[in-house]
């Protein structure tokens, strides 16, 4: 079945019994082959999924609710299609469990089987004051006003354009390299299944001998606005483009996508696993 098949249809049957078969895997190679870069360098990182509508029954038949976070390693052969995950989570709404640990174990097993890699699952009580659930702020400076003094209108593009990174840039370099940390709230792309817009905040920490031109970086981010790509593929495209242009010694790219169907997706790619940040949640989530 194509990813544009049943999952993309407007009318969907929502299962009321536990249905792990609803989970729909999508090969990461679909997006990585389009990028056409070194796939192994895109395999360092995690996709954090946060689910806010998780519910099941205890043995008294009383509904239980929790917030869940799933960590899918970037080296998994597959991702899970987001609507299929929503259907799967809905399917356990009326399933009885003896403990929270049973729920956690079942979800971890099913997701791991779907993506063919070990998925980390955390469940949080609504009363938890867990720091990872509090509203955070991206590190670095916001570049969303970098073009405020520009007299040139930013054009809409059908595809991301990495050549914008070098537009009007000088060849000046920093001999020892410098770390630039910045973010933008303006990343937008389209879901390739439904064509609905996906909005995200994007954060980058990059150590490079090349100076980061904020105006060019913002133009580049805006070039994604009409691009059809899954969340993970968009972040990997950005990681690949920045790697090739800036030749950084260190690079971290992460995005916090806004929630849809009670689920938000937060991919992160790093040049070294030691650079992996902790999962967090932003104000639009």
Swiss-Prot record:
Membrane spanning stretches: none
Record's keyword annotation contains NAD: no
Any one Gene Ontology molecular-function term assigned to this protein's record: preQ1 synthase activity
EC number(s) from the headed UniProt entry: 1.7.1.13
Active site positions, chain numbering: 191 (thioimide intermediate), 198 (proton donor)
Keyword Oxidoreductase: yes
Name of one Pfam family that matches: QueF_N
GO terms for cellular component: cytoplasm
UniProt entry keywords in alphabetical sequence: Cytoplasm, NADP, Oxidoreductase, Queuosine biosynthesis
Protein role: Catalyzes the NADPH-dependent reduction of 7-cyano-7-deazaguanine (preQ0) to 7-aminomethyl-7-deazaguanine (preQ1).
Family label: Belongs to the GTP cyclohydrolase I family. QueF type 2 subfamily.
SUBUNIT field: Homodimer.
Name by which UniProt lists this protein: NADPH-dependent 7-cyano-7-deazaguanine reductase
Organism: Psychrobacter arcticus (strain DSM 17307 / VKM B-2377 / 273-4)
Native organism taxonomy: Bacteria, Pseudomonadati, Pseudomonadota, Gammaproteobacteria, Moraxellales
């Amino acid at each position: 079945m194509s990813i544009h098949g049943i999952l993309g249809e407007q009318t969907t049957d929502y299962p009321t019994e536990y249905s792990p078969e609803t989970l729909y895997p999508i090969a990461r190679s679909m997006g990585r082959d389009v990028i056409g870069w070194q796939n192994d360098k895109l395999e360092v990182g995690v996709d954090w999924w946060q689910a806010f509508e998780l519910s099941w029954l205890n043995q008294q038949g009383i509904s239980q609710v929790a917030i869940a976070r799933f960590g899918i390693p970037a080296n998994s052969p597959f991702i899970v299609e987001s609507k299929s995950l929503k259907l799967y989570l809905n399917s356990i709404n009326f399933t009885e469990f003896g403990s929270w640990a049973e729920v956690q174990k079942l979800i971890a097993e099913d997701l791991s089987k779907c993506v063919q890699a070990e998925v980390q699952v955390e469940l949080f009580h609504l009363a938890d004051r867990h720091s990872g659930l509090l509203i955070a702020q991206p590190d670095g400076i916001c570049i969303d006003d970098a073009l405020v003094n520009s007299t040139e209108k930013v054009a809409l593009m059908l595809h991301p354009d990495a050549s914008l990174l070098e537009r009007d840039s000088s060849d000046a370099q920093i001999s020892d390299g410098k770390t630039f940390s910045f973010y933008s709230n303006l990343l937008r792309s389209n879901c390739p299944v439904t064509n609905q817009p996906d909005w995200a905040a994007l954060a980058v920490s990059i150590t490079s001998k090349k100076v980061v031109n904020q105006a060019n970086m913002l133009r580049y981010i805006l070039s994604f606005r009409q691009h059809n790509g899954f969340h993970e593929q968009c972040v990997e495209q950005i990681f690949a483009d920045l790697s090739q242009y800036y030749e950084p010694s260190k690079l971290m790219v992460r995005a916090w996508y806004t929630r849809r169907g009670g689920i938000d997706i937060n991919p992160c790619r790093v040049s070294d696993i030691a650079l992996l940040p902790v999962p967090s949640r932003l104000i639009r989530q």
